[in-house]
Structure formats: structure tokens, C-alpha cells
Amino acid sequence: LTSAVLTTTPSEPSAKPGELRSLGDFARGSGLQSLVIGISKDPTAKVTVLLVSPVSGRPVLAVKVPTTDVAARAVEAEERALLAIRQVAPRKVVDVIPRVVDAVEFEGRRATVVTAMPGIPMATSYIRRRHTATQALVAADFNAVETWLTELQSGTAGRSARVDMDGGVAARLRERFPDDVRFDADLDQLAEINDRLGRNETPRTAVHGDMWFGNVLLAGTQITGVVDWEASTTLGEPIRDLVRFALMYALFLDRRTRPQRRVAGHPGLRAVRWGAGVEFALDGVGWFPDLFRQFLERGLVRLGAPAASWRDAAVAGIAEVAALTDDHDFARRHFELFRRLCRAGHA
């Protein structure tokens, strides 16, 4: 039954929930066991149901189940994105991207069935004791993502265009923070940053859109899966993925550290306030700031932009998170971080 399920033709993206099999019927027909994980409560709340082999105990399929109308739109967006990315990405990239197997109905909404990717989430190793304090382990994480992004971007590169890190960010920020009295000055600084970046060109490539370490799966130091493609595009600004990974990696360096204490493995970094790890990465001294900057510099040069624009790209990436994240508090914290970094860098 499992092999039959894996070789079925996916239901048309236009099929309405009432035209689909129920999740329960699909799960029973697959011969697999169900395991519910990843329940969230935000506006795009989804439940992930893993269908596990009763023989090997390994996940075979994953079902993205929306619990709100907003989440339903996000699930459908990811389904379309996964189908689209497989049309343009090279084999090495496609091999680590979930494949849409089918769509099912759950409580009147469309849920997407995809292949489960092997490996351990990078987030699991990230939170292990001493992992982010150990230069070799952190470098291996960055190297794995650099290798994969190189394959994705070189394999999907199209026409070149001016670097565009805005993509509606400024407009979204204005909607999100309408009562902020300092907002116009902040937007002026963001415009200056984007103007400097826009003097350069990069190829339009496939973009994941949420390239943080929680969406990367590993076997050793090799990437075996990249998940959560709902924010992706087949033709976008590749610098977005580059800076998103580096920024999110830096953001949580002090997660185990008590307030005001030194962060283990990173001389010069203290857990003094939210975002201290990012400030350290951009303006600090040490092996992690060096690794962070070199990762961005190499990526920018590979894409045809000057290495010297790494800081502008990173700060623009912080503004992007403030604009696009679903969590308003997370957005506000990023916006305040953007302000501090602009002051520090005299943007």
C-alpha cells in the first residue's frame, strides 16, 4: 500500500476539500501509522501528521493540516510552491525537497501530503549543549547551508536584476507600525540601505523565503531535507536566503545564558538584551563574527555583488523579518534591532 501511495498522481491544486479523500481514509489506506507533531497556535496554525512505517518506524509521509482559514491559504501556497520548485531546480536540490504526493480533506479544509524527509533538524543539534560554542560545529552548519544554497541558486539562476531586498517590506512595515512616531526616519534609513544595495545586480533565482536552521535537516554534515516552502518563489532575490540563515543562527546564540552573563564560547558577547547575538555578529570581534561575515561575503561575491555590502544586506534582512513574520512581538523586536544597528552603523 505504501508504494502505491507514493506513486499516485497528486490531486489537482484546484480540487476543493469536498472532492478529496478524508485524512482518516487516506491514513488507513496507506497502511502507515499516524503520529501528530508540531501543533502551533499562531494565525497560520498547522498540525503536522507524520505517517510512519510500522516496519522501520521511520516517517514516510507528512501531512500539513491547517487549523484556520489563514493557515489553509498557507498550506495551499506551499503545495503550489513545491510543485513549482521541482520544475526548475536541479536534481541535487530536488532530492532534498519534499514531493507532493496527494491532497486530503480535514474538517472542511485542504491538507497536503508530502514525502517525509530524512535526517535530524539542524535546530536539534543547535540547542545541544556547547554546539554553538564550538567553532568547528558552527562552521560545519554554515558550510552545509552554503553548499546547498550554491546548488539552488546556481541551478535556478535566470536574468540579472538590481538587488531588491525590499519586495514590499517598507509598505508592510508601514501597515504594521502605523503609530510609531519615529517610523519615517527609520524608513528613510532603510531606503538608503536598499539604494546602496540596488546599485548592484544579482541573478533572479529560486528563493526558499524562510531559510532558518529549523527548516534544515541533516545527516552528519550533509543536508538531507529543506522544508516549509510556503514563502518561496521560483524567481526572486537570492540574497534573502543568504542573510536569513545567518541572522537566525546569530539570534539565538545566547538562548542558554542568564541575563547579563557572558555567552559561552563567544568572548565579548553578553546576554544583555534581545538580539545581542545579531549585534555581536555584525559589530563584534571573534570567530563567530568572522564566520558570519565571511559566509555573507562569499555568498554575495558568488552572486555578483560586492563583499563590502554584507552589512547592508544583513540589516535589510532584519527589516524583512520585522515586516513579514506572523508574530507581532517578534516583528517589533526585530524592528527595534534594526534601529539599533542603523545607529551603530550610521546607515
Feature names for model-found ranges:
Residues 81-92, 96, 120-163, 187-201, ...:
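Conserved kinase catalytic-core helix
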Residues 19-35, 157-208:
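An alpha-helical support segment within catalytic cores of ATP-dependent transferases
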Residues 240-300, 317-329:
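Active-site activation/catalytic loop segments of kinase-like enzymes and analogous catalytic loops
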Residues 45-78, 134:
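ATP-binding glycine-rich loop module of kinase domains
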Residues 97-110:
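Short beta-strand micro-motifs within the conserved protein kinase catalytic domain, predominantly
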Residues 1-39, 313, 319-347:
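Regulatory N- and C-terminal appendages and interdomain linkers associated
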Residues 38, 42, 46-52, 56-58, ...:
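Active-site acidic catalytic loop and adjacent metal/ATP-binding pocket
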